[in-house]
Amino acid sequence: MRKRVLITGITGFLGSHLAKALLAHDYEVFALKRAASSLSRIESIINDINLYDIDDIDSLFRKCGKIDTIIHTATCYGRNNEKVSDVFAANIEFPLRLLEAGNHAGVETFLNADTTLNKYLNPYSLSKNQFLELGKFFSMRKKMRFWNVKLQYIYGPNDDPSKFSAYVINSCLENISELKLTKGEQKRDFIHIDDVISAYMCLLREVDNLNNSFVEFEVGTGHSISIREFVETVHRLTNSRTLLTFGSLPYRDGEVMQSKANTTALKALGWHCLNDFETALNMTIEQERVNI
């Protein structure tokens, strides 16, 4: 019998890739989306998925029957000057409603896409941390398995252009005159979207073999490089003429200077990162070059 998975954030970068992978592995895919969301990332699979409006959570479970797993990837970063209350509504209130409805409908597992950022860095990271605590609360009472997936820095083609990696790649491809940057000493664990998807598929394969009510997995390569090295590598691979001005921007208050995944738990399930940094980055650049 086909496993049935509900995805939030299906129109986003991570969610759309997940949906395509799930269909390729013969999962039945259901999804919640905002009424105004662009469907451009899922046009090729629109007839193969079951789409519901984000306001129809309760009716979704009544109409579609048993859902085995919820994969929650929808989020609000606050990049578009949203009010703090709007960020908290998107990152706490909405997934909490989903937890409650899913629990009532007998959903067995909730996979939560989480951040590695310091919880006090900004409203986004604080809201994600507070929802994590609510997820633990649910799992402690054996209401639903809550698996927290802490994602390092994901990159790949067709990402949100406002994200740092996409902005740097597109700026270098377009040869803008100057790219203003911090000193770039902070280190990040950059992982290609294909490896993130393979991690999720690994977790789904093991979901019935682990009895943990709460468990946390870190998804990354396990290695970090500096922001400066990332930018300079993009600059070299694109043969860009853009002037890189490191140190022209200040660090954010509370900036994380070192971040990399501890992949021990994932590797114990048989997962391994397959893409090396420069090869995956060059693949991303070449795919983005076509879009310019």
Predicted features by range, described:
Residues Y27-S37:
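Conserved glycine-rich Rossmann-like NAD(P)H-binding loop of the short-chain dehydrogenase/reductase
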Residues V5-H25:
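N-terminal Rossmann NAD(P)H-binding glycine-rich loop of SDR-like oxidoreductase domains
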